[in-house]
Amino acid sequence: ATNAAETVFTTAEATKAKAGDIIHIRSAWPGLDEVIARVKEASESSVTLEDINTLNTGDFAAGGGAGSFRVIKSWEEMSQITEVASSGGEQQSIQLQFLSDTTQRNVNTFKTARVQTYTIAHDSSLPFYDLLRQADSSQDTLAAYMFVPKAKENRYWSAKASFNDIPNTAVNTVETVTATLNLQSGLTAYK
């Protein structure tokens, strides 16, 4: 991969990716690894990633972006979602004070891992139950997608799934199950 405002992958073999395809990236660059992106342009030997900026050589070492990608061919809708709860992403810091200084400072370190928990109205006949069970068992990293109508935005990320298919049951409420997505990449959004 190149260091560019819109990253270009050169492929060793002919690619079947085309403009508009959504791809799941594996890269030696941690900031690009597991990212889900849209192909802006494609030729037989390269693809340009839309809005994926790798110019910062502090984060993306020149010549270090080797990897691979796969085209996402289909999506399975998780229907009957009643709630989505997000957690994580909080900035962590350490406090630092030098002996010669009278002021203590906070220094940012990392952000906590991000998690999305989906509460779903229980219906064991829904086709995505089996997909979530398989993803929970294999712990493969999957591409995830959400369209937000009011924002007119397609949102993509990768995640490892956990699925609790035992319904939460209470009087006079809809039974629910939970799917948890442990995010493996940041959000990529396209309008």
Please provide the spans of the model-predicted regions.
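Small/polar beta-strand repeat architecture
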Residues: A1-A4, A12-T15, W29-R105
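Short coil-to-beta transition motif at edge beta-strands of beta-rich domains
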Residues: A12-P30, S137-A143
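Well-ordered beta-strand positions in beta-sheet-rich domains
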Residues: I22, E34-R38, S46, N154-K160, ...
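Short, acidic/charged, Gly/Pro-enriched secondary-structure junctions
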Residues: R26, F128-S158
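Extracellular repetitive beta-rich solenoid segments
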Residues: G63-G64, T112, S138-D140
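Exposed beta-sheet edge/beta-hairpin loop segments within beta-rich domains
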Residues: Q104-F110, L132-S137, V148-K150, P167-E175
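Oligomerization/assembly interface segments of phage tail-like spikes and tubes
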Residues: R105-L126, T173-T188
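Short beta-strand and beta-hairpin "edge-sheet" elements
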Residues: M146-K191
